[in-house]
Amino acid sequence: MIKWTEQAEIKLPDDVQATMENNELKIKGKLGEASRIFRDNYVKAYIEGSSVKIATSKNNKYTKGIVGTWYSETKLLIEGVTKGFEYHMKIDFTHFPMRVSVRGDKLIVENFLGEKSPRSAKIVDGCKVSVKGDRITINGIDKRKIGETAANIERATYIRHFDARVFQDGIFLLKGEVNE
């Protein structure tokens, strides 16, 4: 018989519901629903009352690291479904004016460094991207997906075969924050 000891507890706000099925924690709030799969042999997450608890069967550095990661992931899920997250990016160009637009699930960058063919970046499901002037705003409830979308946009404007000290064009992350 394995003895499980509780290591962390996250209290759920009143307007948030949580369910656990097959190692998948689903958090539902006023902005939507987010989920994360928590699977490990020595650490388990479960729901008891109005809180999410994380327990371990061993007490070592490995399991302490997993407990801390799962704790922060759960807090981010709760924060995402109650407040939401927002990333701000800046369109920066000096040589060639680029045109940025959103088409479906892609962000299209045209005339980047005078290139004839447009570059595209995938927008991950659950993210809303808007372009106003030289700013791009990414909104959503899952911080991982928003970060992945921001990374896709930055990677689409990566400069190769030019001197990066001279050609400083691109789209760069300014800040990521929680909506208030």
Curated annotation (Swiss-Prot):
Pfam families tied to this protein: Ribosomal_L6 (PF00347)
A GO CC term attached to the entry: cytosolic large ribosomal subunit
GO MF annotation terms: rRNA binding; structural constituent of ribosome
Keyword Ribonucleoprotein: yes
Residue ranges of the TM segments: none
Quaternary structure (record): Part of the 50S ribosomal subunit.
Annotated family: Belongs to the universal ribosomal protein uL6 family.
Protein name: Large ribosomal subunit protein uL6
